[in-house]
Amino acid sequence: MPFTKMCTSKLANPLMKYYLNLNGKSPLSKLSNSLNSSSFKFISCSPHIVCRELNTVSGVAIRPQTITKDDKRDFMAVFPDIVRDLTQLNPGISDLSTLISKLMQYNVSGGKKVRGLTVVYSYRMLAPDHALTPENIRLAQILGWCVEMLQGFFVVIDDLADQSVTRRGRPCWYRLPGVGLRASSDALLIQSGCFQLLQQHCKDKEFYVDLVELFLDALRRTTYGQTLDYVSSFPNINHLTMDRYNFITKYKTAYYTYHLPVATAMYMAGIYNAELHRQAKSVLLEMGHYFQVQDDYLDVFGDEEMIGKKGTDIQEGKCTWLAIIAFQRASPPQREVLESCYGTKEPEKIKKVKDIFIELSLPAVYHAYEEETYNLITRQIQQLSQGLPHELFLTLLHKLYGRKQ
């Protein structure tokens, strides 16, 4: 299979080609020495980034201030009102109201809430000073919770489909007593609640139609990505291609994780210019790809306690960045082990797969990808129009760099 079919986001093609051409023969020390060189010259050929030459992997922009603890506290303070809005519509059906409240508490209020907080932070960065009223900040927080509800919806469905064990350090929702397959119906309660809140709080706003279309588009695209993810698992080795992975990542992760929160804030801030939305989307989809590659890496090599869930990609035979690169770089004996062990639930076989990942120096390859991707996206941000504050996008990018959970 030609390399161009096995690369990561085309953003990092030349970097990955350099390392993949080692064919697994170079020891980790040689790889590390290569990483220390400042003489690399790569050409980026991302579908979202104009091709340009990069002289070095150093000299990134100054990292700006990020979301504060006060922002997180204020965001959480709105959550009880969100739950009340959702439960008051059915005052005569106490069982349903109780279930919705429990659903929200268990599946929406936890986690890092990065997507929801991104809506608020983005609005503060994008809106003119006169629009930063307490009422508008509160509305941005409500819309942030709408994004978090979509996240909760996808989490419940994904955990059920993957038969995951834990999420955020607790048993997955479907594993709670009395839930089981009902989790699919419960997830729909969260999804419908998201659109209920949009209607309740935004139907008289100029941006309401754009906002609903944005959420529906994110929902549709993410569903496409989730579905393709489910049907792309090993042992069908023809599914382990980077073209397929790029599609899954773009649709399953990038749209609702990065594009949706920022585009929501843009509409709320009165930014309708199609070119500005195109530029923002271009950067945000690249961040989403970067985010998913990180997730794939952390699923295998991350700290389970810090992440809050047990990695399952190997036993599920997922189409992941690590798996694709491993099959590309593996020697015939290594490939034979991967084909016999990848996608099985036996602990000793899972360990064999992970051992081969290490033999192939995939942690070092990943860190090289991360360093180069961070710098290339930084340069793309620096090319954005003045109507898009660079600090906003640099902050989001910096939150990604080197994350451990």
UniProtKB/Swiss-Prot annotation:
GO biological process: farnesyl diphosphate biosynthetic process; isoprenoid biosynthetic process; pheromone biosynthetic process
Residues reported to bind Mg(2+) 2: D158, D162
PROSITE patterns the record matches: POLYPRENYL_SYNTHASE_1 (PS00723), POLYPRENYL_SYNTHASE_2 (PS00444)
Annotated Gene Ontology cellular component terms: cytoplasm
Pathway: Pheromone biosynthesis
Motif DDXXD motif, residue range(s) on this chain: 158-162
TM spans (from-to): none
GO function terms (MF aspect): (2E,6E)-farnesyl diphosphate synthase activity; dimethylallyltranstransferase activity; metal ion binding
Cofactor field: Mg(2+)
Keywords, in A-Z order: Isoprene biosynthesis, Magnesium, Metal-binding, Transferase
InterPro entries in alphabetical order: FPS1-like, Isoprenoid_synthase_dom_sf, Polyprenyl_synt, Polyprenyl_synt_CS
Annotated Gene3D superfamilies: Farnesyl Diphosphate Synthase
Residues binding Mg(2+) 1: D158, D162
Catalytic reaction(s) noted: isopentenyl diphosphate + (2E)-geranyl diphosphate = (2E,6E)-farnesyl diphosphate + diphosphate
EC top class named in words: transferase
EC number assigned by the record: 2.5.1.10
Co-factor remark: Binds 2 Mg(2+) ions per subunit.
SUPFAM superfamilies in UniProt: Terpenoid synthases
Family recorded in the similarity comment: Belongs to the FPP/GGPP synthase family.
Role summary: Farnesyl pyrophosphate synthase involved in murgantiol biosynthesis, a male-released aggregation pheromone, by catalyzing the formation of (2E,6E)-farnesyl diphosphate.
PANTHER family linked to this entry: FARNESYL PYROPHOSPHATE SYNTHASE, FARNESYL-PYROPHOSPHATE SYNTHETASE
Record text about domains: The Asp-Asp-Xaa-Xaa-Asp/Glu (DDXXD/E) motif is important for the catalytic activity, presumably through binding to Mg(2+).
Protein name (record): Farnesyl pyrophosphate synthase
Organism: Murgantia histrionica
